[in-house]
Amino acid sequence: MLKIADVEFESRLFTGTGKFSNSQVMLEAIRASKSQLVTVAMKRIDFKIGLDDLLTPLRQVGVQLLPNTSGARNAKEAVFAAELAREMLGTRWIKLEIHPDPKYLMPDAIETLEAARILCEKGFIVLPYVHADPVLCRRLEEVGCAAVMPLASPIGSNQGLVTESFLKIIIEQARVPVVIDAGIGAPSQAARAMELGADAVLVNTAIASSASPIVMAECFKEAVQCGRRAFEAGLGRVQTGAVQTSPLTGFLNQ
């Protein structure tokens, strides 16, 4: 069971809501994934019409919403988006995203740390999206973040665990849950992330852009489960040379 702040999750696969062809496909994919935590960008919500076509069906599914500050260019904008989410959605949970570069969407470490400090002081449950930087992740822990969400590779790139060496360090040192976010493009990559010891993964593009999003969601669900079980079972140690599975005995000389 995964616990973040005061909430427990049976599923270690978190999902997003962007890039789906329509809301019905999105809902069916979320159901198939068995995800219990779903991110939604504040910039996509039309509060003028109350509970819009995005929020209403998500609440009917029964998942916990994790509003994000995607689109924020600095700490001030991110804090504003988080406070809007708390007021309009009634949640203290926030996925903190600050990426001023519209091309590569790389997170701004300095602004993210500052926003995290402010939001934690205001009582938010903060899950920051950041570079796979062990030092930064430790600093975010220290200011009170409930989890850290280091990237595997650029958002939506499907490149997989490009930052694996750094993710290993973060997982080793973390005292809060580590959710690997961004760039996971295949179920095998999600399984690998879980084998490393990640507490969860967040997948959106790889599911939403698939020719069969519902089937792909099921595949990711199973991959995450298998990866976690493999981690808990204990993977064999990697050797530099060959190791005999059946050591030679003297029977050949008899």
UniProtKB/Swiss-Prot annotation:
Q: In which pathway does it act?
A: Cofactor biosynthesis; thiamine diphosphate biosynthesis
Q: Where does 1-deoxy-D-xylulose 5-phosphate bind?
A: 156, 182-183, 204-205
Q: Which CDD domains match?
A: ThiG
BP GO annotations: thiamine diphosphate biosynthetic process
Q: Which domain of life is it from?
A: Bacteria
Record keywords: Cytoplasm, Schiff base, Thiamine biosynthesis, Transferase
Identification of the protein by name: Thiazole synthase
- Family according to the record: Belongs to the ThiG family.
Q: How does it assemble?
A: Homotetramer. Forms heterodimers with either ThiH or ThiS.
Pfam families in the record, alphabetically?
Answer: ThiG (PF05690)
Say yes or no: keyword Oxidoreductase present: no
| Summary of the function given for this chain in its UniProt record | Catalyzes the rearrangement of 1-deoxy-D-xylulose 5-phosphate (DXP) to produce the thiazole phosphate moiety of thiamine. Sulfur is provided by the thiocarboxylate moiety of the carrier protein ThiS. In vitro, sulfur can be provided by H(2)S.
Enzyme Commission identifier(s): 2.8.1.10
